[in-house]
């Protein structure tokens, strides 16, 4: 049986995260798979930044990235020590497929396929088109996860879902009762 150390981080800009010490964290924690959200950079930036950790770790990274078509927005990535066998960025409808919010990556682990998903669900604003868009995204996400489950897939969903179900999910829960992401 293979044990994997998996991490997920909303970096809110990967260059800023590296300025704040992310490279040291990666070297200290030594994850096998890292899912990133709100990358806000190009694939070349990810390759360059994570290359700085490779000597200390003794391995190179496999980098898959779904950048948003709007530069400086969203973007999700999966970095791994092991080579992926496949990846997909299509969630559907088409409006989501260019938003840099969904990335599925398959790995062969002990002869079985493990699908790792990195996703970023925007917060949405109450009673606005953004909230409608968020619910459409969540519906598409649910349909995709149902399809994966029907196939018997082993799946790990990682990301910033911007959803709080209980008081424990958010620090200031009373102040957020009427905010998107923490609605009844």
How should these model regions be labeled?
Residues 1-55, 63-76:
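N-terminal, active-site-proximal structural segment of metallo-dependent hydrolase catalytic domains
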Residues 53-56, 137-184:
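Metal-dependent phosphoesterases centered on the DNase I-like endonuclease/exonuclease/phosphatase
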Residues 5, 62, 115, 154-156:
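Proline-centered loop/turn at the N-terminus of a beta-strand
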Residues 92-95, 121-138, 172-179:
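Surface-exposed cleft-lining segments at the edges of enzyme active sites
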Residues 14-18, 97, 133-140, 182-184:
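Soluble or luminal CAZymes and related metallo-dependent hydrolases
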Residues 40-124:
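Structured beta-strand-rich core segments of catalytic domains in phosphoester-bond hydrolases
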Residues 23-27, 102-111, 140-153:
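Short amphipathic alpha-helices and their capping/turn segments at secondary-structure boundaries
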Residues 15, 43-45, 72-73, 124-127, ...:
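Short catalytic/ligand-binding loop motif for oxyanion handling, primarily in non-cytosolic enzymes
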């Amino acid at each position: 049986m293979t044990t994997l150390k998996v991490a997920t981080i909303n970096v809110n800009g990967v260059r800023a995260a590296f300025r704040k010490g992310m490279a040291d964290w990666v070297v200290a924690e030594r994850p096998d798979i890292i899912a990133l959200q709100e990358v806000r950079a190009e694939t070349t930036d990810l390759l360059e930044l994570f290359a700085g950790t490779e000597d200390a770790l003794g391995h190179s990274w496999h980098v898959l990235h779904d950048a948003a078509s709007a530069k400086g927005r969203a973007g999700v990535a999966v970095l791994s020590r092991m080579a992926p066998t496949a990846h997909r960025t299509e969630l559907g409808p088409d409006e989501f497929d260019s938003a840099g919010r969904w990335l599925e990556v398959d790995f062969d682990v002990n002869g079985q396929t493990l699908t790792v998903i990195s996703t970023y669900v925007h917060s949405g604003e109450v009673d606005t088109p953004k909230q409608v868009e968020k619910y459409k995204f969540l519906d598409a996400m649910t349909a995709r996860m149902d399809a994966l489950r029907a196939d018997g897939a082993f799946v790990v969903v990682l990301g910033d879902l911007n959803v709080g179900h209980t008081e424990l999910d958010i620090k200031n829960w009373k102040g957020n009762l009427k905010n998107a992401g923490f609605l009844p």
